[in-house]
């Protein structure tokens, strides 16, 4: 039996669509994430100037939504992982979690093609943690998580296979 403080859990699931420009495409991406999650997405802004693409700092170029708690687990298990057939590359795993891309939103179960939206893909990133990680985020008496308590790539891969039924390719 595993110690309760060593139990791995989902901190958050972040869904991101990088459009690369503001305007109609950005509004479509915003609407897609709103329909998929039932939450209000936030627009992400450019940090650097890219002259060739007509991007300047502060210009909205993408949308993202962060899911936490039971809702994050439910959407990951019922919608996002079935869209990629529960298969994720080993190189997609890090010490903090794992990420994967969904080429077109119509691959997600329950999502129908909408001619107004067109075909849009999105990225999902799952951030994992153990109980006790709050010591790094709190404001008072902030501290570091010890190296033995910190997650590593092998533990995350094992957890994803057992808990979520993910196949590593």
UniProtKB/Swiss-Prot annotation:
Coiled-coil segments: none
GO CC terms of this entry: ribonucleoprotein complex; ribosome
Domain of life: Archaea
A GO biological-process term: translation
Record key words, sorted: Ribonucleoprotein, Ribosomal protein, RNA-binding, rRNA-binding, tRNA-binding
InterPro entries in alphabetical order: Ribosomal_uL5 (IPR002132), Ribosomal_uL5_arc (IPR022804), Ribosomal_uL5_C (IPR031309), Ribosomal_uL5_dom_sf (IPR022803), Ribosomal_uL5_N (IPR031310)
Function: This is one of the proteins that bind and probably mediate the attachment of the 5S RNA into the large ribosomal subunit, where it forms part of the central protuberance. In the 70S ribosome it contacts protein S13 of the 30S subunit (bridge B1b), connecting the 2 subunits; this bridge is implicated in subunit movement. May contact the P site tRNA; the 5S rRNA and some of its associated proteins might help stabilize positioning of ribosome-bound tRNAs.
Family that this chain belongs to: Belongs to the universal ribosomal protein uL5 family.
Record-given protein name: Large ribosomal subunit protein uL5
Organism: Nanoarchaeum equitans (strain Kin4-M)
Name of encoding gene: rpl5
